[in-house]
Amino acid sequence: MVLVRVLANLLMLQLSYAQKSSELIIGGDECNINEHRFLVALYTFRSRRFHCSGTLINEEWVLSAARCDRKNIRIQLGMHSTNVINEDVQTRVPKEKFSCLSSKTYTKWNKDIMLIRLKKPVNNSTHIAPVSLPSNPPTLGSVCRVMGWGTISATKETHPDVPLCANINILDYSVCRAAYARLPATSRTLCAGILEGGIDTCKGDPGGPLICNGQFQGIVSWGSDPCAKPHEPGSYTKVFDHLNWIQSIIAGNTTATCPP
């Protein structure tokens, strides 16, 4: 009888903890430590605080958002918990940075992309490995995975110790146009989210990856303010539409131009 009571009390504590944990996040959960080997954190030397994410696409190149550009950027790879550091964490600085437009003049609606060449290549390890560029664009309705260390509250800037992951859907571009009146008629972006709200990327997540069916399809760009509002999905730079530019830069053609 005593054992039954003890087990019942433990179950109640577990349920209570689970409920409180779910109330602390914008629709996400802690990522599995093995599912984000390509996810990198961007921070500045002075702040030491993650302001953006990025995606490792080979041992020497990281793809992020133009809005994430800063002076004295540091790139941390192999991170999971900010409290318990993985043994294979590596830190790099940029050798070169390329954007379609200057980070000061890019439009909020388009061309939010930055390619970073690392000063020193990284070594693949238990928690570090690149992700492949997409072979095809994502299909409408695809279930995609977003991840990052962005704020876990829509009203107060509170960052988690570990990256959070959540599933969202690729939506028709017209859904984003209906939500944001200033969007152009066409754009090289993806509209993605949950129409009911409650699940969204937020401050600190820009530059991170949108993974659809195992392929790197989007770069977190911007969304509603406050985050996770119903019928106001997020905007993601469409990686597939920028493949030629990305591959040309990596191949050494540093004067390559982005798609119009």
Curated annotation (Swiss-Prot):
Glycans are attached at N123, N124, N253. Disulfide bonds join C31-C165, C52-C68, C100-C258, C144-C212, C176-C191, C202-C227. Residues 19-24 form a propeptide. Its main location: secreted. SMART domains: Tryp_SPc. It is found in: Secreted. Expressed by the venom gland. The keyword Disulfide bond applies. Gene3D superfamilies: Trypsin-like serine proteases. Residues 25-251 form the Peptidase S1 domain. Snake venom serine protease homolog that may act in the hemostasis system of the prey. This is Snake venom serine protease homolog. It comes from Protobothrops jerdonii.
